[in-house]
Amino acid sequence: MARVTVQDAVEKIGNRFDLVLVAARRARQIQTGGKDPLVPEENDKYTVIALREIEEGLINNQILDVRDRQEQQEQEAAEIQAVTAIAEGRR
């Protein structure tokens, strides 16, 4: 199944080099970033899960960029709130 997934995923992304980058980025998110897979895991490795997500059109580079920006903004907002709370506590 992985071979078919790779061919279909290449068609979704455009070329195999970008596919490698997007799939690796997504697999890393699933493995270490605490991101939940968007497809059933079915005992697959993280890279295969990432390829299946790409094949189904659930993940691409733009989607990953938007999600990363949203997370960064949320993290920055939380940091600002923490600094504000500390500053108000010193008054």
Curated annotation (Swiss-Prot):
Gene3D superfamilies found in the cross-reference section: 3.90.940.10
EC number of the protein: 2.7.7.6
InterPro entries assigned: DNA-dir_RNA_pol_omega (IPR003716), Pol_omega/Rpo6/RPB6 (IPR006110), RPB6/omega-like_sf (IPR036161)
Broad class of enzyme this protein falls into: transferase
Alphabetical keyword list: DNA-directed RNA polymerase, Nucleotidyltransferase, Transcription, Transferase
GO biological process per UniProt: DNA-templated transcription
Catalytic activity: RNA(n) + a ribonucleoside 5'-triphosphate = RNA(n+1) + diphosphate
GO MF entry, a single one: DNA-directed RNA polymerase activity
Any one Gene Ontology cellular component term annotated for this protein: DNA-directed RNA polymerase complex
Top-level taxon: Bacteria
Quaternary state and interactors: The RNAP catalytic core consists of 2 alpha, 1 beta, 1 beta' and 1 omega subunit. When a sigma factor is associated with the core the holoenzyme is formed, which can initiate transcription.
Family statement drawn from the similarity comment of this UniProt entry: Belongs to the RNA polymerase subunit omega family.
Function description: Promotes RNA polymerase assembly. Latches the N- and C-terminal regions of the beta' subunit thereby facilitating its interaction with the beta and alpha subunits.
Protein name: DNA-directed RNA polymerase subunit omega
Source organism of this protein record: Pectobacterium carotovorum subsp. carotovorum (strain PC1)
